[in-house]
Amino acid sequence: MEMTADYLRDRAWQYAQLTRLNRPIGNFLLLWPMLWGLWIAAKGLPDLKVLVVFVLGVLIMRAAGCVINDYADRDFDGHVKRTTHRPMANGRVSEREALTLFVVLCLVAFGLVLLMNPLTIALSLVAVALAATYPFMKRYTHFPQVHLGAAFGWAIPMAFAAQTGAVAPVAWLLFLSAVLWATIYDTQYAMVDRDDDLKIGVKSTAVLFGQADRAIIGVLQGVMLAVLVAAGLVVGLGAFWYLGLAAAAALFAYQQWLIRERRREDCFRAFLNNNWLGGLIFLGLLLDLHLGG
């Protein structure tokens, strides 16, 4: 096929959609927990090289995760209202293109992590395995959201390893909070697709929880906040940290109000609201580390 400007422009747009460059919310949901971990590991002053590598690595691996997700779901997405427009669902990107792009993105991310220490490099192999296997979990288990949380949260122990050369116990508390958080917001996200998922046999926590979804999400929200309180106690954080958590609790209450009738658009709004929640927790951490004395 002739490489005309129009063709290249079209390919770039298809790949941008495939990697969700047009939907940056996922970038933030990945970045916030990593930033919590890195700032706590560094006591407020992260190494610039580590910060740059991790921000770029998170963005690249999120793009790779979106690609392999669409590859795995290529036969399902055409039957789900929200995903019928995706490039693989309507044949605008081939399977070979998608797999090639996934491999290239993973290699670029691995090239970045090679700038880090051996422990971080070893942990990165787990990150790739989690990212590559997550999209297939919905065929075999009702808990793909938990797997997603592990994939999203794995940047936390990696950040500790890169910054300090070790993974402190508090890193695993933060990792647990990230798993819980992803389970919360991805269940809200899955509530948008629940009717379609039931028809085509796709598993999710939203399908499993059924009418108990709001109550279970509420329990998970409470446990997540308790874990973050424990993390703050372990490292001696002060008032600003807990003010950030109080703000997060208020947003969790708002999300419960949004999903009260389980309308698709309101469940999606609750999902999007988590970006503000992650940012407020990070703001509380920043203020505490730099102004808390």
From Swiss-Prot:
It is found in: Cell inner membrane. It catalyses: all-trans-octaprenyl diphosphate + 4-hydroxybenzoate = 4-hydroxy-3-(all-trans-octaprenyl)benzoate + diphosphate. One of its GO terms (molecular function) is 4-hydroxybenzoate polyprenyltransferase activity. One of its GO terms (cellular component) is plasma membrane. Its EC number is 2.5.1.39. The chain crosses the membrane at residues 25-45, 48-68, 101-121, 142-162, 165-185, 223-243, 271-291. Its cofactor is Mg(2+). Keywords: Cell inner membrane, Cell membrane, Magnesium, Membrane, Transferase, Transmembrane, Transmembrane helix, Ubiquinone biosynthesis. This is 4-hydroxybenzoate octaprenyltransferase. Catalyzes the prenylation of para-hydroxybenzoate (PHB) with an all-trans polyprenyl group. Mediates the second step in the final reaction sequence of ubiquinone-8 (UQ-8) biosynthesis, which is the condensation of the polyisoprenoid side chain with PHB, generating the first membrane-bound Q intermediate 3-octaprenyl-4-hydroxybenzoate. The keyword Transmembrane helix applies.
